């Protein structure tokens, strides 16, 4: 029979055992220790609920065992070290430092270890620990903390492919001791990525499985011929036992996932490349954009993974070239690092040349990222675009990367189908098309500085350059040359057209105010539009040679 202190330890641990202990798992182990008999095991196994099995297990163990050692050994053997540590610390503090028992053992230590167990049971992936984007991680924690009292909500974590959305979500859930276990009772993390109509049904079938307790897994019903209405009803019933669960839908592509989650009134953290899927939600929505790494972050990122820092101007130029070509994309930088063997700047310079000559497939390797190359991930983004948006993206290849370009110049090459010759309507249609590309995968980025401009990053341009056929590139250059010539012949120095109504708040009273002459101005002025290709002659000469090869 256990002594009083050990009996109290088991009583204190009862709540924890309810969360994370199945007595059936321990029966065979303890039979081998001659603590339980076959009759004891049969009695416990026949209990219909886990709560009954736990209660009878503890009742028998208190009377049959002489110490907690065998049970502690089982918890270590069963990868439940947080339970073993709790019992050991309880006994130690209860005997040697009883005043510290509650604050030291019962509260903080167990909550952290229980969090790890909850993350494991919730299918939350283990992510990198050597580098954390503190700003983004803390924003996710803050938003989830602020929204925890809402009946249902969506927090959208959106950004370009390979920007680290899933990593940030996982790091936020692992970093905070308050989110899982206090603000939210439990968590369910599932990868979506589906594009087929049946994908949503399969995803929520997995949710039903995750919501079921271990008691029900062996009796999990077949859903092969179940309708979506019945499946939703089954999930609602399962949510009665898991009312305060945070759901993480990773890499959502279809808005149908959002519609299902809204019908079920779930609390959701969603990672996606397409922020437009949020339009399907009518509940409370919050957004966090995951941008590319800044230059100093790129240095820290590579240094955290063991890349030596540059010594001298030549090595610094090589590293800056890598950062420029990757556009600060974490997944691409990771591929650079994994491919850079030995870790020298000579090898990195070779990879830069390979990337420029062969495109993103030139740096292809296995990393923690889901794809071997970013080209595969971007291709998947393109596949879900409409034909009109794909066509617009293809012609974006004739624009120089890293340059903020006014919509007027984009209108020279982006194909749109309108029945009017009005320049204002044309520019509005082109602006809408480019905005969609900036929302659906961050394929472009837009600014108002103070006119509306759009920019294509180096990494997106490099991708397009090697997937768009040469004839389309040649046609785009030819069309741009012709349109710029027409603009020059019309002597358009100051646009006379009206600014669209939805841009009115950015309107200036004169052209000189619209395009202020400051040393920081980087946007091409209207009178320089005809000279656009001359200003970027090196780029266009290179692109023409590439299209001719």
Curated annotation (Swiss-Prot):
One of the record's GO cellular component terms: nucleus
Effect of residue 234 to E: Loss of dimerization without affecting interaction with ced-9, loss of ced-3 activation and severe reduction in the number of cell corpses in embryos in a ced-1 mutant background
Occurrences of domain NB-ARC (ranges): 133-417
GO biological process, one term: positive regulation of apoptotic process
Keyword rRNA-binding: no
GO terms for MF: ADP binding; ATP binding; BH1 domain binding; BH3 domain binding; caspase binding; cysteine-type endopeptidase activator activity; cysteine-type endopeptidase activator activity involved in apoptotic process; endopeptidase activator activity
UniProt keywords, alphabetically: Apoptosis, ATP-binding, Cytoplasm, Magnesium, Metal-binding, Mitochondrion, Nucleotide-binding
PROSITE patterns: CARD
Biological role: Component of the egl-1, ced-9, ced-4 and ced-3 apoptotic signaling cascade required for the initiation of programmed cell death in cells fated to die during embryonic and postembryonic development. During oogenesis, required for germline apoptosis downstream of ced-9 and upstream of ced-3 but independently of egl-1. May regulate germline apoptosis in response to DNA damage, probably downstream of let-60/ras and mpk-1 pathway. Regulates CEP neuron apoptosis in response to high Al(3+) levels.
Protein's UniProt name: Cell death protein 4
Native source species: Caenorhabditis elegans
């Amino acid at each position: 029979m256990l002594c009083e202190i050990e009996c109290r330890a088991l009583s204190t641990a009862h709540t924890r055992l309810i969360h994370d202990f199945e007595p059936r798992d321990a029966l065979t182990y303890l039979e081998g220790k001659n603590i339980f008999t076959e009759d004891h095991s049969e009695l416990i196994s026949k209990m219909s609920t886990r709560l009954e099995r736990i209660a009878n297990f503890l009742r028998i163990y208190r009377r049959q065992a002489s110490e907690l050692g065998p049970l502690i050994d089982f918890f270590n053997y069963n990868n439940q070290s947080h339970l073993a540590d709790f019992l050991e610390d309880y006994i130690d503090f209860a005997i040697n430092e009883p005043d510290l028992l509650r604050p030291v053992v019962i509260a903080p230590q167990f909550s952290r270890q229980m969090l790890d167990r909850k993350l494991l049971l919730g299918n939350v992936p283990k992510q990198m620990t050597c580098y954390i984007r503190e700003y983004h991680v803390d924003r996710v924690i803050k938003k989830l903390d602020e929204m925890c009292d809402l009946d249902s909500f969506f927090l959208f974590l959106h950004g370009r492919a390979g920007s680290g959305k899933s990593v940030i979500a996982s790091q936020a859930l692992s970093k905070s001791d308050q989110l899982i276990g206090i603000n939210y009772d439990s968590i369910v993390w599932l990868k979506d990525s589906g594009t087929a109509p049946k994908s949503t049904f399969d995803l929520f079938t997995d949710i039903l499985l995750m919501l079921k307790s271990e008691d029900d897994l062996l009796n999990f019903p077949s859903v092969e011929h179940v309708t979506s209405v019945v499946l939703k009803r089954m999930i609602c019933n399962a949510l009665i036992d898991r009312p305060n669960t945070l759901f993480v839908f990773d890499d959502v592509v279809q808005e149908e996932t959002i519609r299902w989650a809204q019908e079920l009134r779930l609390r959701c953290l969603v990672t996606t490349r397409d922020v437009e899927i949020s339009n399907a939600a009518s509940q409370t929505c919050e957004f966090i954009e995951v941008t590319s790494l800044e230059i100093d972050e790129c240095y820290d990122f590579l240094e955290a993974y063991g890349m030596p820092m540059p010594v001298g101007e030549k090595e610094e130029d090589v590293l800056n070239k890598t950062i420029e070509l990757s556009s600060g994309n974490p997944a691409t930088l990771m591929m650079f690092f994994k491919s850079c063997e030995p870790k020298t700047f000579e090898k990195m310079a070779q990879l830069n040349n390979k990337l420029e000559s062969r495109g993103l497939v030139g740096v292809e390797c296995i990393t923690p990222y889901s794809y071997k190359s970013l080209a595969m991930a971007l291709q998947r983004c393109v596949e879900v675009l409409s034909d009109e948006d794909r066509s617009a993206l293809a012609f974006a290849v004739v624009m120089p990367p890293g340059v903020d370009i006014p919509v007027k110049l984009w209108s020279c090459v982006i194909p749109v189908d309108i029945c009017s010759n009005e320049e204002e309507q044309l520019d509005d249609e082109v602006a809408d098309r480019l905005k969609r590309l900036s929302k659906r995968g961050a394929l472009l980025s837009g600014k108002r500085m103070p006119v509306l401009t759009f920019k294509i990053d180096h990494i997106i341009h490099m991708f397009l350059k090697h997937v768009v056929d040469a004839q389309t590139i040649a046609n785009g250059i030819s069309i741009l040359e012709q349109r710029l010539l027409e603009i020059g012949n019309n002597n358009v120095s100051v646009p006379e057209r009206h600014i669209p109504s939805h841009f009115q708040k950015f309107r200036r009273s004169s052209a000189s105010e619209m395009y202020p002459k400051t040393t920081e101005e980087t946007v091409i002025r209207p009178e320089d539009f005809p000279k656009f290709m001359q200003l970027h002659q090196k780029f266009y000469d290179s692109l023409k040679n590439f299209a001719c090869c």
